Every structure is written in C-alpha cells, then in structure tokens.
Amino acid sequence: MKLSRREFAKANAAAIAAAAAGLPLASTASNLITEADMTRLDWNKAPCRFCGTGCSVMVATRDNRVVATHGDVKAEVNRGLNCVKGYFLSKIMYGVDRLTQPLLRMKNGVYDKQGEFQPVSWDQAFDIMAQKIKQAIAEQGPEAVGMFGSGQWTVWEGYAANKLMKAGFRSNNIDPNARHCMASAVMGFMRTFGMDEPMGCYDDIEAADAFVLWGSNMAEMHPILWSRVTDRRLSHPNTRVAVLSTFEHRSFDLADIPLVFKPQTDLLILNYIANHIIESGAVNKDFVGKHTKFARGADDIGYGLRADNPLEMQAKNAAKANTWEDMSFEQFAAFVKPYTLERTAKESGVAAERLKALAKLYADPKRKVMSFWTMGFNQHTRGVWANNLIYNLHLLTGKISEPGNSPFSLTGQPSACGTAREVGTFSHRLPADMLVANPKHRETAEKIWKLPPGTIQEKPGFHAVEQSRKLKDGVLKVYWTQVSNNMQAGPNVMQEILPGWRNPQAFVIVSDVYPTVSAQAADLILPSAMWVEKEGAYGNAERRTQFWHQLVKAPGEAKSDLWQLVEFSKRFTTDEVWPAELLAKAPDYKGKTLYQVLFANGQVDQFPSEQIEAGYANDEAEAFGFYLQKGLFEEYARFGRGHAHDLAPFDSYHAERGLRWPVVDGKETRWRYREGHDPYVEKGSGVQFYGYPDKRALIFALPYEPPAEAPDDEFPFWLSTGRVLEHWHTGSMTQRVEELHGAVPDALVYMHPDDAKALKARRGSEVKVISRRGEIRARIETRGRNKPPRGLVFVPFFDANKLINKVTLDATDPISKQTDYKKCAVKIELVSLA
C-alpha cells in the first residue's frame, strides 16, 4: 500500500492517538505500524570509541549493522552532545578495506618473511604463532617475547593480555601505546601523591573561576569538555581562561590570557609561578604545613636515548632519575627564587604582564583554578617534572581536591585510564597501582591469580620505545600488537621501528580492523572485532568506568582481541613455557594449558552464560561456555577493592552511565582525598593524600633543563606534531569516514607566513620536512586553525601518506619513558611553488 506524505502523517497521528487511548487502529494505521516494524531501530548505550573524555552515545542497530548514533542525553559527561567525530561513529566499522580473515606472509605455500600476504585459517595463524613463541622461549627465555597493546583495549582485553604475558609467558615485555601519551601523567601522580589518576572530576568545570590550559588544545582534542568550559566562561563574566602553547590554536579564541612560549620553557614558567606565590605571600601555610612535604628531585637525568648516545653518556643521574631527597620549605623557596619574572619573560618569550596575570590566577585565594593538560606536558623529555610542577602550584595554595580547584590531566584514548593504567598493562605495573618490582605486589597478584610463588618476574619489561630497539637488536623475537598502529604513531620510524619489525629474526603479529601501516609491515595480520561488535568496558579521564553490550556481529572471520588472547592460550602447556623449579611448586599445574591455569581457573569461569542480559549476543561466552567478561572483571576488581581503587559489582555498570571509582557501598567518589567526599579519608582530617604512609603530598624542586635537540644553523626550525579535530590519532578509523576525510584529507605543514616567504614559498607550496632521521613531503598552510610563531612548524600525524614520525626523535622522559613528539629540529626545503 502506498501513502502520500499527508496520508502518512494522518495515519501516524491516528496510530499514536489510538494507542494512547487504548482504541482499535484503523486499517491504514495498522498497516503503517506493520511497515514501521520492518524498519525498527534498536537503541542501546555505549561510550564513544574515540578520546578519553568518555562521552556516552546511543547506538542504533538494524539487521546486524550500526546505522546511526547520537549523543546520550542521560549521560553526565556529554549531556547529549557529540563532537564531529562522534557524529560519524556509525561509519567507522564499515570501511571497504575491513580485514575479515587472517593473512600470513607466504611463498610457495609456507611462511616467508619476504612473502606476500595470503589468507590462512585461524588454526594456521595460531599454529605458527605458537611455534615461534615456544621456540623463542626455549632458546632465549621469556624476554624474547613481547606485546604492544593499547589504551583502546577494553578493560578485560587488557587484563587478559596482562595475565597471558606476565603470568603465562612470564614476560613483562608488555606495554600499551598509552606509554606515548599518559606515562608522564602516571609518574607525576605517583611521585606527588603516591597514587595514580585525578583527584577531581568534570564537575569541577562548573565550579571553577579560572581555567589554565598547559599544552592542551581542548577546543579540538576534547571539544565536549571545551563546550562546558566555554559555557562557564561566557555565563560567568568573572571567569578567566589562560592558554599556554608553543603555537596558537583554536583554544586561543577563548583566551583572556594567551601565552605562546618557546619550547621547553614551560618549566621556567611553572617555577616562576611558584616563586610568585611565595614572594606575594599567597602560600596557604596551614594547608602546606598539614598536608605536604618538600623534596629535591634528581637532575641531569638524560633523555632516554640509546645508552651509547653522547647525551646519555654525559648525564650524571640517568641511572637514578626517579630519586629525590627531603628538603625544607625554606630550601624550596630558595630554589625557585632565581626564577624571576624578568628571567622567565626573557627566556620564554612571553610578555612579562601576561606571565604576571597568569601567576595571579593561582595566587588569588578567592579564585578557584582548574588546570588542564595533555600531550604538551606529557610528550616532553621532562614531562614528569612538568606534572610535578603543576601540582606544586595547587598544593602551595591549597587549591586541590575540592569543587572547582583541580589539577586535571586529560587523556587521549577511551581507556588509557581504565585499561592501561588501572589494569596495569605497562611493562612495570600490575593492577591497581601495583608494581612488578615490589615483592608484596607480586605476591598479591600471584595469590589472586592462583599462581605458584615466583611466577611473575621482578624485573620490569621493555617499554614501548625500548621494544622497537630490542626488535632491531634481535633481542625480541616474537612481537604481538593489538589495537595500535605504532609504525605510524611511534617515533623515529626509519631508524628504529621499521628496521626492528623487518628484522629477519623477528616475527611480528598485528591484530587490527584495517590494513594500517603497521599491519602492512607485519608478518601475520589477525582480523579484529571492534567497538560494539563485542561486549566492552572503558575507563575515562575522571575515573568513570562504563560498560556496553555486544550489539552486532563482526564481519567475516574477525574476532575480538579478547577471544584471540584466550583462545591462543590453549596452545601452550605449563611444561612448555614454565621452568621445572616453578612447576615443582605447583605440581597440579603440570601438563595443564595456560587457558586452564589463567582463564578456566575456577574464578574467571565461575559465571554461567545465562547471566548475560537477555536479548544480547556474546560471542566470547558462546565460544568458551561461560560469561568471560564478568569473570575477568570480578577477578580483576579484587586488586582494588579495599585499596581505594574499588570498583562496583559487574552488573551495576550495565545499568549506569558509568561510575567514578572508588565506589564504596554503591556510592561513587567525585573528589578524592577530601573528607566528606572520599570514603578513605579519616574523619576530622579534612584532607589526606593517603597514597603515602604519612598521608602527605610531595612538592618537588625541579629545575629547567634544555631539550634533547634544538634548532641550529643546519636544522633551523622546531617541529611539533599532534592532532586535528576531524581525525583521531593515526586516522585508521576517521580516514575511512567520507565526511571526515573530505574535510581534512591531508596533513599540512602549518607555518608562519614570514617563514614561508623567506623560503620563497607560499600557502599550498609543497615542501620537504627534513630531520637527521628522515623526511616527508607535504604542503604548507599559512592560515587557518594553527598559527605557529616564526621558527616553528606543526604537522599532524593522522596521515599515513605523510608519516611525520619518520622525522621525529625517539627521546623520552627518563622517568616515564614517554616520547617527546613536540620538540625536534628540522629544515624545510621547497619542492614546488604550487
């Protein structure tokens, strides 16, 4: 039956009215309802797949396909809004080149490092993986096996990977790509507070009187949070916004105090503000006396380069970078005294009046301050110091752990906090802030995991940058990466990463959804399920854990990373990967598979599939015969419950738009360390930084030190890399969305117009960006969103056709091991005028 638009509207209105009144429907209305049922959409909640903000979206599915999404109006984080990437979530899974079957490099029907990719079965793929790992462990020990994971792993994927590597293969060589983005934030928290993750939450935005952005372009990288900051600024005229960066970007549009500083001199500015607070009498003496102590950190700590690099050989304290000594307040005041307004203005290039206006925001006792930072701070050879120094300002003034007063580290990935940090998928960590080097922590993990003593190795494994070096050097023989694209995102691709991956001694496996640069450089590609093709959990920047159900099936033979990890564990018996002396402590485990020991261990497999909410698929439960996700989560939660990392019971999260840990007696925590908000703070104490036994936070004396590489006559420009609004990280998802790719198809070299003119170039000219390590070609942009000062260029890293990380330096913070992508020296050469 065909209806005109007018007839359709009338019939639809009749149907609604009749249904509301309980009346029988007219025949035309009945037909309409029947036809509508054929096009019915099923809507369910899920956290966004992109950044660490943790927006919730409503996902519409029909006929095993995601067909639409919109912002979740019930979500506290985004309140129904999405950024431009979020609006196109429904398209990220359906690129024409989606991987749907395992692919192995082969020649004449057998594996060959120089062969072409050919389809194989999952059994064939796992057979060669198992063969390579068994051979590597037998010949060289657990150190020969490594894994590179992700802040995009779901909580249970990261947890399963951690167990398989650290307990099953007994190798701590597992690290997430969050090493590139959040490791300095982690160590900043750990050094200052003795515990990781923010004390505040997004609610601080609506209570703050000032916002200070340190190396954070929130307008493009965290636009939903920026909309809340903007609303606060425009609706409360007394609110002020300060933005600090090495170049102007869109966040400067809202800035009352704009500050463009010379690279690395943020350390000078931070120490100047501390000095201003002291000299102006703005120290909160009562707070400082009760809740803090002072420490002098080691200096001259090197740059995390190879040991034979002259910069490392000259560094006096490279071996003890993460050490400090006690000092007094008076000694601290004397330490920061040389960081005067005059010196800071001269060396940073920022006008003195702007520096003073910034310092006054922190010093004013009547103004609540929220500090935000992301990669500008963290991707820094002194990123941990920068984190420590921003905490100094909040601690000296007592502006912390209360509504509106909040130093807040923003995250870039959806579960960099919930998986990489909280689960502990770093090479030196275990769940809930525990460390592999701590015997008590290893003992706790071994008890929870039901393992014999001594299973977990005490030596930290290779971190992300070191993994590339060890592949190149032939130390790592088997390397499995999941949910990451390090061949595009990692530093110094041509000298370190590519030679390592293509080392004839190495066997590299990539689990992904698209044929990324990394996949194309691998030996074996495994097709993965993504986002709502599996049941998942993420943890966002404000400690909010969010769950979602599996809503559709993955295409072809694609499988979730969780299935891959757990199914693969069946290929090994303990006799093949554990030494005899370890098995002697647990004779019942002899001959058992790692699957039986790690996953079918009476804990992980205790929840039957029947507990899955009716109406939802769960491919892993179907494969293994139990509710795997629930079992992994409840076992993992044992690490944190009772230790200020409390997670709610598993079933609570499917009913909520996320809960912020610690969750005690069903109540989430918005402000940590503050009495009345945090259940772990003792009554009458007001504030307790209970990460340390004395419940005091550390205020660090740390100096300015220069970057690892700076411009010179041969390479006269600074290079900074980063992102743009329309694309996320390496663009493997967003570049496959026609609207986003069409908006920004290519990475550009953002440059000051006068620098372009000096090169006899102009907007649109093609140039080479050349460093001591590699080069790329791209076109110049002298207008638009990013406005570098003279002597600096900015190039985003989303474009696989313009791999800017061929150019970058693999210098890292010696404490956090996080890469500095914001500072290296390049030269620019004109290719064509355009």
UniProtKB/Swiss-Prot annotation:
* Gene name for this UniProt entry: napA
- Select a single GO molecular function from the record's annotations and give it: nitrate reductase (cytochrome) activity
Taxonomic lineage: Bacteria, Pseudomonadati, Pseudomonadota, Gammaproteobacteria, Pseudomonadales
GO aspect biological process, one term = Mo-molybdopterin cofactor biosynthetic process
Predominant place of localization: periplasm
Quote the protein name from its UniProt record: Periplasmic nitrate reductase
Check the record and name the Pfam families matching this protein.
Molybdop_Fe4S4, Molybdopterin, Molydop_binding
Mind telling me which SUPFAM superfamilies this protein's record contains? ADC-like, Formate dehydrogenase/DMSO reductase, domains 1-3
- The residues that the entry says bind substrate are F797
The record's annotation in SMART domains points to: Molybdop_Fe4S4 (SM00926)
The UniProt annotation places Mo-bis(molybdopterin guanine dinucleotide) binding at: 85, 152, 177, 181, 214-221, 245-249, 264-266, 375, 379, 485, 511-512, 534, 561, 721-730, 805, 822
Q: Which keywords are on file for this protein?
A: 4Fe-4S, Electron transport, Iron, Iron-sulfur, Metal-binding, Molybdenum, Nitrate assimilation, Oxidoreductase, Periplasm, Signal, Transport
